[in-house]
């Protein structure tokens, strides 16, 4: 998949399949974009390491965590909140769960390693204000993020926690998408990927 170096609209309704390449196994390199609002970048040179990563497995009844070097997180039922830098690997299947990167948290790498995650009330993944996050799709894996019609602020049946997108990047968030696996995004609410500003595309193949 290739993105030209031009503004790229990711405010997508319906189904979206994202296949990106370019993550290699070493330390995370930084891509930045200066904007008051959230920015999503697809990149060819963002790198990550699984060494010392903290791993989570989602199920319909909860989230289990395997020991790793990074403990900046909290779990409440099927909701995972990350509040400190580190590498976090997520897998499993959950019909109503979520992942939130807490506002102002930088240098987070979130590795999708065979994750099927649906949220019935909000965005399955929320990158809070002024966060710095690399979302890496692990090679050889199929991953699916989905929401429901209740995740639409414009709907009369909207959830109180609605974000109107499956992947929400709030103001000031810098989010890099990369990886050679497959990410399927199914938006029943409104948008597939939404940030607070026009998204910038970088070539990814």
Predicted features along the sequence, with ranges:
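A composition-driven surface/loop motif
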Residues: 2-205
